[in-house]
Curated annotation (Swiss-Prot):
Taxonomy of the source species: Eukaryota, Fungi, Dikarya, Ascomycota, Saccharomycotina
Oligomer status and interactors: Forms a complex with TRM82.
Entry EC no(s): 2.1.1.33
Keyword annotations: Methyltransferase, Nucleus, RNA-binding, S-adenosyl-L-methionine, Transferase, tRNA processing, tRNA-binding
Keyword Iron: no
Positions of the catalytic residues: D176
Protein name, per record: tRNA (guanine-N(7)-)-methyltransferase
Function: Catalyzes the formation of N(7)-methylguanine at position 46 (m7G46) in tRNA.
Location in the cell: Nucleus
A molecular function (GO) term: tRNA (guanine(46)-N7)-methyltransferase activity
CDD domains according to UniProt: AdoMet_MTases
């Protein structure tokens, strides 16, 4: 059997699990029907490293945060009697890749709903299958119920998902550097986008950035420092923050940089209070 055929068969099997378990509350009744699930194999979900954020992707998104049905992604936090969510998403990993950061953040913030946004189809499918397997295999302790992923373009539709001041943390881990100058407008940090991030981030909330590309690091720092609603946090603060430690070592891209003995550049910024208009 060729690799292409094996890949198709593997994806079909995982798609069946995804259809059955993607939106259900994983509990003892599900365990009785489903054997322990193996974690997905990344080699069957290969896709290009980056995706053009300006392309006309076929994406589903709510017309406003009030129209977003979070119960499908976080059924454990849905009160069926009151027909409402018991919590809101407060942590977002923009361009979450293969989900390593979310998975390490999950036990550290068990009462926080964490969302990964990823634009690539197969990478999103991989993270969905990874979370389904983790939820199923850790059902007795309700493990990993607080994380999920959706396919979305944060550069276009972030305010469609989140209310003003809803988020407490936003992560940008190893984003596409877009090396060519004519592509800089596609970088995840720009003046316009920073105003959108400031809108969905609460006062005192944190933007976390990490990259192995010095030019991109300097670009993000420059734009964040020049924005009136963000202020850089000190290296001493970074050294004491557990999220920085997790971000440095949890992502698949970060592990790759570590193996290649590359540099990692980190910068964190706090959301300042919005000034009163006189």
């Amino acid at each position: 059997m060729s690799f292409s055929t094996r890949r198709q068969a593997y994806r079909a099997e995982k798609q069946d699990h995804r259809k059955e378990l993607k939106h259900v509350k994983i509990d003892e009744s599900v365990i009785e029907k489903v054997d322990k699930l193996s974690l997905p194999k990344k080699k069957f979900y290969r896709q290009r490293a980056h995706s053009n954020p300006f392309s006309d992707h076929q994406l589903e998104y709510p017309i406003s945060p009030a129209h977003m049905d979070w119960s499908k992604l976080y059924p454990h936090f849905y009160d069926s009697e009151k027909k409402k969510m018991t919590k809101d998403v407060t942590i977002a990993d923009i361009g979450c890749g293969y989900g390593g950061l979310m998975i390490d953040l999950s036990p550290e913030f068990p009462d926080e709903m964490i969302l990964g946004m990823e634009i690539r189809v197969q990478v999103t499918n991989y993270v969905e299958d990874r979370i389904i397997a983790l939820r199923t295999n850790h059902a007795k302790e309700n493990g990993y119920q607080n994380i999920n992923v959706l396919r979305g373009n944060a550069m276009k539709f972030l305010p469609n998902f989140f209310n003003k001041g809803q988020l407490s943390k936003i992560f940008f881990c190893f984003p596409d550097p877009h090396f060519k100058q004519r592509k800089h407008k596609a970088r995840i940090v720009t003046d316009t986008l920073l105003s959108e991030y400031a809108y969905v981030l609460k006062e005192g909330g944190i933007i976390y950035t990490i990259t192995d590309v010095l030019d991109l690091h300097e670009w993000m720092v420059k734009h964040l420092e020049e924005h009136p609603l963000f202020e850089r946090l000190s290296e001493e603060w970074e050294a004491q923050d557990k999220c920085v430690s997790i971000m440095r070592n949890a992502t698949e891209e970060g592990k790759k940089v570590e193996r290649n003995k590359g540099d990692k550049y980190i910068a964190c910024f706090v959301r300042l209070p919005t000034p009163d208009i006189i």
